[in-house]
């Protein structure tokens, strides 16, 4: 194992390097504040890279996650073995640093906060923001591993080896974070890294240990310079500024790291292309870059609850913002008027609309209503005449007319006896007195009765519920209230013998009885129009009868004249067309005349007397027989002709009758 001076250097060297780093870091911090205008702390590792071009930056020394891809393909198992050897030596070095308080005092006085800020920017590549809040021991181990990695390699191989180490650490830590979201935040880097170192120690080789021991001093000097510059810049920030600006520092640092990683990727790409790397390395490098960026964002999100535990107490959380109701937190619109209480006028309670009053001058009417005031709903058998009675203008009721009251009910037509009237007359002294035909009598038992002419009605008193019945006097188009009714009166007939009761029962009987809609009136005399029509009908029948008699008589006369004529004489041409001249006239008729004689002669021929006589007689008889046979042959045709003649006669007779009937109709 190398000596402590070889690893950390002497005190004189550290002081000289600290001065140089202080001057460089101060100028870098001024340039960073002027350029960005963001938080005072910024990203110290990035400021060192921008300000001091001669001094190597953290990215150049340790590399970026995006550079891991190319180095991993070329280094292989050598990088893993070197990394495990470096970690074993880093653990021994951390033990020595814990026992040496002088080294701690040489730095900014508080190594734990400085180590936290320093390692928050240097360790673990894309995920070093999430590891910035770990324990002091974990950060010191990261620092020592970084130093050992630098000493393991030459100047050309430093960047690749450091990239391999950081990518392995970031990938291992990302796997642990995805598996346990809650337990990963509580575990420190110190617990993870020893496990990895134990697994890799089994693969160590003695040759790699020797190479790492030779290369340590060169890298340790650079680490001391970077640590001293970072340690002196960090105390300048107060604790409160760190708490307030912690959230702002992380996104800025991550953005700047991505820029440097892009620049370094381009340089690595050029160097690897010179060495013959193909396009597959570029594709894998781009994928690794995207994965690291997403992991760094996820780690920064998970770190916020731990880092901001103090800021939550000072400034409150996001839940406190939406605690109030939407309606209460809404500020009033700029154009909307606001009342004294800060509420818009629309939300104020609407004021009641004042009553509309119209001033009108009307005369006041005072009426003497007496001591008692009663509300009366008159039945249909009572009525009141409001105008005074005057015999000159009195009009009696007509039975045919229907009398309707103010409510539309039909009044019983009792004429004078059921109407309350009043009149003005003068007494003996000449004073005007109001007189009525009705009066109310109050008996000793408290009951009352109404006497209207000769009729008596019982009066019943009942209280009224509520103040809904008022007495008004009409004043032009308005009404003037006078009193409120508290009691009401009802009237009923005193007995069934009264005329009013009889009228009521009769009216009910008339309503119940069915009236006959069709009435039959007796005929006092005969209608002259009907008699005239009947006389006309009789005359027409008589004329028709006379016409019939005349037609019958005419037919009888015609029949008598037509008896001597026959069809054989009227139509001689129908028979014997071969014969001509006078012989052709009615030959059939002549034959018919002698038919009877011929038959008699036949009887004589076949009689018993035929044997008697002379031979001459026999010869004559033969000749006659020959003639008869010839005549008999012609008889069938003659009979047929006779039948046709009879039919013709019959047809002719029918035709004549029809003519007569037509004449009769005419």
Swiss-Prot record:
The modification Phosphothreonine is found at residues 188, 629. The modification Phosphotyrosine is found at residue 606. The modification Phosphoserine is found at residues 10, 14, 66, 151, 154, 162, 171, 179, 197, 205, 212, 220, 229, 238, 246, 254, 277, 279, 294, 296, 300, 607-608, 610, 614, 630, 658. PANTHER family: LEO1 PROTEIN, RNA POLYMERASE-ASSOCIATED PROTEIN LEO1. It comes from Homo sapiens. The keyword Acetylation applies. Signal peptide: none annotated. GO terms for cellular component: Cdc73/Paf1 complex; centrosome; fibrillar center; nucleoplasm; nucleus. This is RNA polymerase-associated protein LEO1. Residues 32-44, 316-325 have a biased composition (Low complexity). Residues 1-14, 179-192, 574-583 have a biased composition (Acidic residues). Pfam families: Leo1 (PF04004). Highly expressed in skeletal muscle and heart. Weakly expressed in placenta and liver. InterPro entries: Leo1. The gene is LEO1.
